[in-house]
Amino acid sequence: MFKSLPEEEAFRALTLTLQLVASLHDIVAYTFSFAKLGNCPACFDLPLSPNPLMRDWGGAEGIGNELQELQKMIDSLQRPQDPSQVAQALLLRREVTLLQFDAAMRHLLRTFLAAGNAPAYQSVAESACYGLPPLSNALGKSIFSSQLSLPQPLDPWSPQAFALFPWRAFLEDGGPFPVISSVPDTLEYDMQMCLCGLSDCDRRVAHGELVGVQMLMEDVLLGSCHVIRKASTEWQAALDNAQPDWSKLPGLYPNQLESHPKASALLEGQCDVVMSLSLLKSFLILWKRLEVLKEHWGRFKLRGQDINSALLHRQFSELYEAEILYPSMKALARQMGKEDEFEELMLRSQSILPPKGASEIEIKTQQLQKLLESLEIHMIQEVLRKVNREMTLFLSEKSKEESTLPTDRWKHQVMKENFSVMRPQIVERFVQRLMEDSQDDGPKITFRREHLEACILSLGCDVMARERSNFETYSMCYEHILQHTRQKLSQKEQEVDLLRRSQVPSEDCAGQVAELSHDMIMEITALRAQLTDLEEENLNLKIQIRKEVQEEYRELVQALFLTCLRIKEKLDENQFNLIQKVCELIGEVRAEGIANVKQLKKTWGSARPDEETKENTAKEQLCALEQDHSSTLAALLCKARSLGRWRLAVQQAHLRGQLSRAEMESILSKKECLRIKLMAEQEAALLHQQLLAARQALTKAQTDNRKLWRQNDTQAQLLRELEHRVTQDSVTRQQLDIIKTSGMEKLLKDVEQKEQKLQLLTEEAERASKRGQLQQKKMDRDLKQMRNRLAQERSVKLDAFQRVQELQSQLYDIQWPSVQMGSPVGLRSQTHCSLSSASTLSRHPHHHFSKTHFVGSKMTRRIQRPKTVPVKHNRRIEDGSLPSVKENVQLTTFQAQTAPSGISFRPESFSS
């Protein structure tokens, strides 16, 4: 394709072509695979299938729209005619689609767990373990990479490795068989593997998750448009100058992002396509890292349990919301200046929602940072626990009375220094074992090889056992001697310390006595203070108990007082009601009596006037009204008295409570004052001790200062010598570095030469294979020609053979006239048949050569003659007439007699 171009330009053009073709192939393959996820395979196998494509998963319209959007994306580039820019955009599109499908599958697992759909979760989890890794950017090593591996610091994906070791980098990620071009495309199989075990309902849920992730990508792109516009010019130059690792061509698939009109308009117009795809790629990578860290953090919080059930997922969600989500959202709201609004939103809603105006990138970044902080804190705590554990073990071993290692418990019992080593019977045992299976033949003694080897092996074991026992005994003896000397040395050191302490001057002794007496006085005062505190506490407890009892009885008295008041009120009410009822009854009786008196007066004719009766009734009514008024006033007076008593009791209870609180505060203030006094005395004592310690430290510092001045001079001299050594070492290191760099350069040159030689050898091998193929074709042609020649020669030889047979038959007829006289008809018929067959073979050699074995067998029967023909005569005729035909005739006769009837005489059988 690019043979007319120079080598470098042809290589670059071929690389760009492969990049474009690989990316476009994966995009189209993903488009069809995505449509097949919701449709039956027969819709794509048959061009005129009656089953229509489902539009939920794209369908035919979705495939067409996807390809149109892809063309629009390429046209919206700054330089759509530049193949490198187009290849870069297609590669980013493919990577974004890969990460989008991966994020959708991970979110689908969380959705199934949150809904409690355990079978669907198990199916997707088991299938994704096999389906997602081939779709990711995992390394696929070749079977030849073990022989030609990359050096250790280099990464197979780095441009440096691809530039220095292109073939080895290709083998590190080119699949198991990188040279074979007929590797099947497993993209559709891997996508279907992730969703193969789902039902129709669960498959619709999966489709909803895919669409949801797609809409989330559109929201991220719309929310970050200003960032893309701002950094478009800077990133474009960096992306143009960057050389991506094009050796990695994993099977990826297209993005469904631009199906939304807003996102497509964004990609086409205002924002740069490459910047948009780069932003989406970074967001998806951030999301994947967050999901992986969430899974690891959840497993750590749940003590190593996998989150594979609804209960565990609920526990994980609660822990994550409390420890990660809420702090991260609160920090984000604080950064945005909306902390109060966030708190109000948290109070109004039960769930944790992000603050208004926060983008998805900021939300996930905050969660990722919080997860990393939590994991770092956990790691630091684990390290601190381990350090504390080791320190406790170290201190426990150090605090033992005997400074011996813990290996002493595995040692033997204590032995004395004077011991004697027993002489092992090694030689005697060896001789005894050797002579057990020996054969004595007088002056010679023979042994079997296996027996001798076994005896030598046992001898070696005995010798090693003796050496080990000697080592153990001597080491124990030396260790016990050292332990004894150490004990004696420690005793001597203790005696020396006691002597030094006994020789302390009198001033120091007086100071020590004063300090001891002061300490004793302080202890006595502290004990007295504690005793007084205890006595006061005892009194306070008694008073408090009395007050509690009084309060309890006071409450009872108040309750009784209230009940008495209520009973008295009820009695007053009853009395008032009773008086009213009695008055009413009296009034009624009086009215009835007056009425009766009036009636009697009317009947009997009384002489008194009615005015007196009227005055009496008026007076009685006034008296009744006054009595009612006085009774109401008495009831009000009783109520006022009871209310006043109740108020007085409440005020007394309130004042008693204030008095008890004031007493408690006074007691606490007294305790605090006493504690402050004790603390002041203790601080004074501590300051006095610190002053003495400072004086002693000052004297020690003066002595140490003199020593340090002396050591400084010696260290200065040593430092000069060390500087001289360091300079010499630096010179030698520089020389070694120069030698190493030169050696590395030589090694790199050798490696490049070897790679060039390897490429030349591979080219020569290909050329040799081509030459071998050409030679094979030439040999096939020569073989065909030889077969044709042999067929012709065979036909000629068969003609000659027939002629020889005719001559032999004529000779036989001449020599045996009696036989000829006996059967002339049969012989003539045989001769005629042989002549006719010979003539037909001579005229049509190729047709007769392809006949079946039946014709050959007939011909062989005709050729057979009686055995009475003289052998010498036959040999003379054969040797004299046709010597070259003899072997072929015998071979033909033998094959005709021994071959089965189903095998035909073909030229291939004779040519071989």
From Swiss-Prot:
Keywords: Coiled coil. The gene is Ccdc162. PANTHER family: COILED-COIL DOMAIN CONTAINING 162, COILED-COIL DOMAIN-CONTAINING PROTEIN 162. InterPro entries: CCDC162. The keyword Repeat does not apply. This is Coiled-coil domain-containing protein 162. Residues 1-35, 220-276 form a coiled coil. It comes from the Eukaryota.
